[in-house]
């Protein structure tokens, strides 16, 4: 289809997004071209600008436009506490709680031997260096509670402990506002074991 090669290219480009299949990509492309060409231009410009301007923070690896992100530069943050998260989205979730006032280290992934993702790929060497700088007193492992997230937390925790760093892990438990009968058994078991 030479007369729709631009449309096909747009659909294929949209399919690169996580969770977007052919049908969703087509729907988005058709919407932008049929109903929101101005929005398509805004999206195109924002994407191009982000692709050239956004990079990784030299200290925590999150996304930033400067060499060091605003969180790392904030003198009000508690530099003795370092929270390790998998993604910038996880960091944003932690920030929305307003409960953590320390600094972060964003792995930009998690260990996954089956996918060829090892410690070097997620910056564990940088994390170990930063956590051993003499300023950090506690590293909070806030990786997800999936098999890969648990493996990542375990590997990092063991490496940090060998360096004499105090390591804690986010607690697991029953979500606030949930009814016990609807909570999965694994969550109940962990909540019971980790009770205080």
From Swiss-Prot:
Gene Ontology MF terms in the entry: DNA binding; zinc ion binding
Keyword Ribosomal protein part of the UniProt annotation: no
Domain Toprim: 80-175
GO BP term (any one): DNA repair
Pfam families: RecR_C (PF21175), RecR_HhH (PF21176), RecR_ZnF (PF02132), Toprim_4 (PF13662)
Renumbered zinc finger spans (C4-type): 57-72
Keywords: DNA damage, DNA recombination, DNA repair, Metal-binding, Zinc, Zinc-finger
Family stated for the protein in its record: Belongs to the RecR family.
HAMAP family in the cross-refs: RecR
The protein's name in its UniProt record: Recombination protein RecR
Encoding gene per record: recR
